[in-house]
């Protein structure tokens, strides 16, 4: 009888805890991100402000004013110029190239290695456009591994309703958005 009572108490406690922490707040890494079918690369080109990102090694020195500038190269690759402000107040930048991986240009591989080293295998990161609004003003970018995620906007600020909508899309794709860091944009 005591064993039955203990089992009931434990089961009830687990049920109560599960109600306090709904499953929707946790990342489901079994859910695979899906890139949009296609993007108009000419409309996508230009300056984007980072609104939020998942922490990563490559951005460890960036504390504010992170932007990405995309340009179309003659060979149909995409020029990438990422810039940010460091803790010391210095602007730093990194130049790279993105290589389209599908006909719709929504899946790319990006390399920031010097041009002579970009041929080295396994040195390019995934850049998938997971969502973009029809006017190309807001975009959600990630990849299949759930390691990288960015919310980008054409303006330095994004209204909360739009931010929450893109956050929900990221959750639906299995990203742990509790780790997302909002980017300070002072320019």
What kind of region is each of these model predictions?
Residues 3-6, 10, 21-187:
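A beta-rich soluble binding module of mature secreted/lumenal proteins
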Residues 18:
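A cross-family signal for key residues in well-ordered alpha-helices
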């Amino acid at each position: 009888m005591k064993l039955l009572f203990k089992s009931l108490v434990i089961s009830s406690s687990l049920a109560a805890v599960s109600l306090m922490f709904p499953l929707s707040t946790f990342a489901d890494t079994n859910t695979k991100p899906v890139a949009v079918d296609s993007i108009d690369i000419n409309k996508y080109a230009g300056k984007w402000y980072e609104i939020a990102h998942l922490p990563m090694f490559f951005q460890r020195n960036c504390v504010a004013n992170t932007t990405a500038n995309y340009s179309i190269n003659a060979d149909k690759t995409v020029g990438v110029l990422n810039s940010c402000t460091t803790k010391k107040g210095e602007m730093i930048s990194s130049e790279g190239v993105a290589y389209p991986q599908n006909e719709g240009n929504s899946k790319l591989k990006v390399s920031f290695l010097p041009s002579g080293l970009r041929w080295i295998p396994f040195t390019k990161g995934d850049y998938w456009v997971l969502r973009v609004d029809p006017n190309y003003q807001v975009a959600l970018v990630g990849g299949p591994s759930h390691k990288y995620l960015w919310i980008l906007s054409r303006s330095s600020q994004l209204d909360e309703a739009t931010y929450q909508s893109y956050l929900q899309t990221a959750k639906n794709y299995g990203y742990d958005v509790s780790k997302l860091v909002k980017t300070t944009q002072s320019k």
